[in-house]
Amino acid sequence: MSRIGRLPITVPAGVEVRVDGSVVSVKGSKGELSHTVASPIEVALDDTTLTVSRPNDERASRSLHGLTRTLIANMIQGVTAGYEKKLEIVGTGYRVQAKGSDLEFALGYSHPVSVSAPDGITFAVEGPTKLSVSGINKQQVGEVAANIRKLRKPDPYKGKGIRYAGEVIRRKVGKAGK
């Protein structure tokens, strides 16, 4: 049995979980999320405990077992505490500023680059070179942060670009000059 999948999920106080057939809905103080569970996997709710089980040991069932348990646990974490990714901008003249709910970047291109926040995502600019992406859906927060990082990936020679906070960039040695 899956080591992750067999762990029960405890539902904290203030979180409402509904299981309607194959749809699991989680509602908390920050919002509501739902997930459709794949067909061989079953989810059972007992008071404040969610258990995820599988009917057999086929490869597909085994792989979906731990995944489903983790996705539901992430939904519960999202509606209680939420998720946040912090980004840093490194480079001369590289900066970000908030324009309403959008972000406008100066990244060394001939034009400013603007990014709008999708539903459920909020941006916070903590300075001209620091920003954070937050929301209740872990996958969506990570995807938006990755798309922002993709605007100007960190350069392996000088380290300039957009990086996650705490990310270590593997630096390359430049060519040996005479």
From Swiss-Prot:
Lineage, highest ranks first: Bacteria, Bacillati, Actinomycetota, Actinomycetes, Micrococcales
PROSITE patterns: RIBOSOMAL_L6_1
PANTHER family the UniProt entry points to: 60S/50S RIBOSOMAL PROTEIN L6/L9 (PTHR11655), LARGE RIBOSOMAL SUBUNIT PROTEIN UL6M (PTHR11655:SF14)
Biological role stated in the UniProt entry: This protein binds to the 23S rRNA, and is important in its secondary structure. It is located near the subunit interface in the base of the L7/L12 stalk, and near the tRNA binding site of the peptidyltransferase center.
Family per similarity comment: Belongs to the universal ribosomal protein uL6 family.
SUPFAM superfamilies: Ribosomal protein L6 (SSF56053)
Gene3D superfamilies: Ribosomal protein L6, alpha-beta domain
GO MF, one example: structural constituent of ribosome
Protein known as: Large ribosomal subunit protein uL6
A Pfam family hit: Ribosomal_L6
A GO CC term assigned to this protein in UniProt: cytosolic large ribosomal subunit
Biological-process GO terms, alphabetical: cytoplasmic translation
Organism of this sequence: Pseudarthrobacter chlorophenolicus (strain ATCC 700700 / DSM 12829 / CIP 107037 / JCM 12360 / KCTC 9906 / NCIMB 13794 / A6)
Domain of life: Bacteria
Keyword rRNA-binding annotated: yes
Assigned keywords, A-Z: Ribonucleoprotein, Ribosomal protein, RNA-binding, rRNA-binding
